[in-house]
Amino acid sequence: IGKAYSGFQHVAKAPLVQLDSNHFLLELFHGPTLAFKDFAMQLIGQLFQLSLQRRGERVTIVGATSGDTGSAAIEAFRGLAGVDVFILYPHGRVSDVQRRQMSTPSEGNVHAIAVDGDFDDCQARVKDMFNDFEFRDSVRLAGVNSINWARVLAQAVYYFSSAVALGAPARQVSFTVPTGNFGDIFAGFIAKRMGLPIDKLIVATNQNDILHRCLTQGAYKTSGVLPSISPSMDIQVSSNFERLLFEAYGRDGAAVSGLMAALKAEGGFSLSQGVLEMLQRDFQSGRCS
């Protein structure tokens, strides 16, 4: 763990900055690629290497990115033994800084691949690879997107550390989280389920506001992705929202599979009023552009 976070540029790793009497900013940009995903990715890289060295094995890691996941993954795994990394990103839809972070490392085990499409297209290809069991097993496929549970688990830690610094468990805290693929805010939901006294988790979206529409109206309907200056939020199919639905539907896998089938076939689905009200007890949302 110490090695994973040795490259962070602030002694607190995730410092809190007070903006007003009850308003604080949690700074998550002190990692090596300046992305919050460094918190999980740096740890996962070290855990992968430790496990693979003990077993004498090699794996192939694939991931999809709108920018920050890819640069964080390549930085975390570059030069590590036993790992080959392939990151798919949408051509022309990541920032120039992140494109350079992904494409300029010289280590032979990391590869950035531009895809003609958007992030959802990249993510779909990664899911297809994992669903092709023969291919998955032949190349020993592993993932670093937030479909990997370790990503979510590692991100839950700073919800605990920041809430405790602000007075938890005696004091409730709410978190507003810029949200695209729903992984970071889902980590907050897991922290709440573990007993952290979180009042509300507030989903902040841009014009790609499918999550805001779903949490306020109960309809999860896809539309075209609108490019913005925040490409990690330019997403229509939020993978970790499926995990939240699994909890909201009482861990009924068949019910959630039906919703996902409707999403694929019809471009959306509607929540029951009971499920919507259940989600609204924990979540609020807002949109800005």
Give the predicted meaning of each segment.
Residues 1-289:
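PLP-dependent amino-acid enzyme catalytic core
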